[in-house]
Regions:
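Structural signal for alpha-helical transmembrane segments and their membrane-water exit/capping regions
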Residues: 17-33, 137, 184-191
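Helix-loop-helix "hairpin" substructures at the membrane interface of multi-pass membrane proteins
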Residues: 89, 93-94, 103-108, 112, ...
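Hydrophobic alpha-helical transmembrane segments
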Residues: 11-16, 41, 49, 70-74, ...
Length: 322
């Protein structure tokens, strides 16, 4: 069972940190406070938030999915190739990207549940496979998706809407909010969600209580793959041209966001609300640091310390509860 008081406290703290972080960067740098910077950050946030929502489920079971970053790129490349070389309708290509993600998630689940591979090793293997596969299929050439002005570029409007006065609004943020509410409901109020938490809390007890642990393990990785596929579409809409061989490291930002948002690194605890807020904390941190003079290396160092702090807080909190 999830303790509501603890959950809301965690989310509130992370939400305050997010607001404070944004205000600090905006105060120090006038450029960071520009509306165009905000829109750019919102664009990037779509695929990061989607990956974080998906990976939260394996994390809550005590597992991990390292394939979501390179997988997202691979699925976007697959859909882009279908449109570019085979004139496949955009909607069909998007569906293929999503199903590709679900398929890799299924493979991860089978490797872990049926074959008994550790989640870290199994998903590391599929991470390498998807990264290489994207390069092989495309010949290492970048694959452009249709632009918003092209007839088959309608999918861009899912993530951004332009008003009559040319003001652009981050419509994708609305989809993130709706998906967050939906998946939080799934986690907290469905059998799938309750069993996911139960497996992460005590796998042996879950087995003894009659839960088909292998089945639900496969399911959580399919959910992770599903959201990586959705993230692939968001990535294609925002970035427009997908470059093979990229994506490595994005999974760490998504996982880091989930942990910062309160998902326990050892499983059994977490919310989708907190996960998404945590993903935005990592995003604001990574986007804001360059504006105050920190280079890419320093960004990695600071982000690493933030994650260490989040994991330490989780460990201390679990000891206090015990």
């Amino acid at each position: 069972m999830v303790k509501k008081k603890s959950i809301f406290t965690q989310e509130l703290i992370v939400g305050i940190v997010l607001i404070a972080l944004y205000l600090v960067f905006r105060t120090i740098s006038a450029d960071f406070g520009k509306y165009t910077t905000f829109l750019s950050m919102m664009d990037i946030s779509y695929y990061y938030a989607l990956m974080a929502i998906g990976v939260a489920f394996p994390l809550i079971t005590g597992g991990v999915d390292l394939s979501i970053g390179t997988g997202m790129i691979c699925y976007a490349l697959a859909g882009g190739c279908l449109i570019r070389f085979y004139n496949v309708p955009t909607g069909v290509a998007m569906l293929v990207s999503i199903l590709f993600g679900v398929g890799i998630g299924l493979a991860n689940g089978v490797l872990i549940s049926v074959m008994g591979l550790p989640p870290f090793l199994a998903t590391l293997c599929t991470c390498m496979i998807t990264r290489g596969l994207g390069s092989v299929v495309t010949g290492s050439f970048a694959i452009p998706w249709p632009t918003a002005k092209q007839p088959n570029g309608w999918f861009h409007s899912i993530f951004k809407i332009t008003l009559a006065d040319k003001t652009k609004l981050p419509l994708g943020l609305l989809w993130i909010i709706l998906l967050t509410l939906l998946m939080q409901f799934v986690l907290a109020h469905t059998r799938f969600g309750r069993y996911t938490i139960a497996i992460g809390s005590n796998k042996e007890a879950a087995i003894l209580s009659g839960i088909n642990v292998k089945f639900y393990h496969v399911m959580v990785y399919m959910v992770s793959g599903l959201f990586a596929g959705l993230a692939a579409i968001a990535y294609a809409a925002v970035i427009k041209t997908v470059q093979p061989g990229t994506g490595a490291g994005m999974e760490l930002d998504a996982i880091g966001g989930a942990i910062v948002g309160g998902v326990s690194a050892s499983g059994g605890y977490g919310t989708i609300y907190g996960t998404v807020i945590g993903a935005y904390v990592i995003l604001v941190l990574k986007q804001g640091l360059p504006y105050i003079g920190f280079n890419a290396n320093m960004q990695q160092i600071i982000t690493g310390f933030v994650l260490i702090g989040a994991v330490t807080i989780d460990i201390v909190k679990r000891k206090v509860i015990k």
